């Protein structure tokens, strides 16, 4: 029986790989719109990757520009080409999984920023993840535990809990994981990383009250995937628990990581938002286009 189950799952994954490989990559890249020092700029690069402008600082969160995620072909082009990013002050990585911590992208960011302005950015990672990024060229590595704060110039960064796991391979379960809330004097933004729905959304909202929430909506089928990922409806409930003004969905439409129809997450999110009466607060961003919050 076990062998039958293994063969069935291997066959399903093989179909996922073949479908990814045979699907034509779509989308286009754009130059990011630049925000003023008093504005919050949010640019969706794809998957869980964002270029963020806040408090006059430039950040990348979970940057991944890979054409292939090991055997899975990227289905949509990055919304911003790596070489078109301005010099970055900070890079935040939510956890060590390959779709969130992409070493070649991180190495290129450190190199390009150092070339443009003479100094590589600081990289912020969860506890026990620093060794993975230690030789990528960053000027400083900051490791954080949940609820720990790090101040950089005019920003405060808080590492927040999530319901996921942090191992990059099979035995390194000591690695941390979570999300981040980044706050300036005027704006705040929350990136959840990967997470299932959990009571922590309410606690994050109570403690930090983020203005904008970047929440994952894909990789929820089969049902047991929801032990570590949010469905669209779960993500919307997390948004309501947080009490944020706006939600921006992520973790969908870039890599085929699970077995729901590829276009289903966004459709279900829009239906759930309409039912809850918050459609005007759920902003699905096109890759490469910048949303400016005044």
Residue ranges and their predicted role:
Residues 1-60, 65-69, 287:
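Zn-dependent metallo-beta-lactamase
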Residues 16-37, 125-187, 267-294:
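Metallo-beta-lactamase
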Residues 26-34, 54-96, 100-114, 167-171, ...:
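Pre-active-site segment of Zn-dependent metallo-hydrolases
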Residues 41-44, 70-78, 193-195, 229:
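Short gly/ser/thr-rich secondary-structure transition/capping motifs
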Residues 41-44, 58-62, 156-162, 188-194:
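Active-site-proximal beta-strand elements of phosphoester/diester hydrolases
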Residues 52, 62, 95, 102, ...:
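Divalent metal-coordination and catalytic microenvironments
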Residues 63-66, 95-96, 128-129, 160-164, ...:
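Active-site metal-binding loops of divalent metal-dependent hydrolases
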Residues 90, 121-124, 128-131, 198-286:
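Cap/insert and terminal regions of metallo-dependent hydrolase folds
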């Amino acid at each position: 029986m076990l062998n039958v189950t293994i063969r069935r799952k291997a066959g399903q994954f093989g179909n996922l790989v073949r479908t990814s490989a045979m699907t034509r990559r779509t989308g286009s890249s754009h130059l990011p719109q630049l925000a003023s020092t008093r504005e919050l700029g949010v640019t969706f690069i794809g998957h869980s990757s964002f270029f963020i402008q806040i408090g006059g600082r430039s950040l990348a969160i979970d940057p991944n520009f890979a054409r292939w995620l090991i055997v899975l072909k990227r289905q949509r082009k990055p919304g911003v080409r790596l070489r078109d990013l301005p010099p970055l002050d900070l890079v935040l990585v939510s956890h060590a999984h390959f779709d969130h911590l992409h070493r070649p992208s991180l190495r290129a960011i450190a190199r390009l920023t150092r070339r443009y302005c003479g100094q590589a950015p600081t990289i912020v990672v969860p506890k026990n993840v620093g060794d993975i990024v230690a030789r990528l060229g960053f000027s400083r590595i900051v490791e954080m535990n949940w609820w720990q704060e790090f101040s950089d110039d005019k920003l405060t960064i808080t590492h927040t809990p999530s319901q996921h796991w942090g191992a990059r391979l099979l035995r390194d379960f000591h690695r941390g994981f979570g999300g981040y809330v980044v706050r300036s004097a005027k704006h705040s933004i929350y990136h959840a990383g990967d997470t299932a729905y959990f009571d922590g959304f309410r606690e994050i909202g109570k403690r930090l009250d983020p203005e904008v929430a970047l929440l994952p909506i894909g990789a929820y089928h089969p049902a047991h995937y929801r032990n570590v990922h949010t469905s669209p409806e779960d993500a919307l409930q997390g948004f309501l628990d947080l009490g944020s003004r706006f939600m921006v969905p992520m973790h969908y439409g870039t890599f085929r990581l699970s077995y729901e129809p590829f276009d289903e997450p966004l459709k279900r999110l829009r239906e759930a938002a309409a039912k809850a009466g918050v459609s005007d607060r759920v902003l699905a961003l096109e890759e490469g286009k910048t949303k400016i919050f005044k």
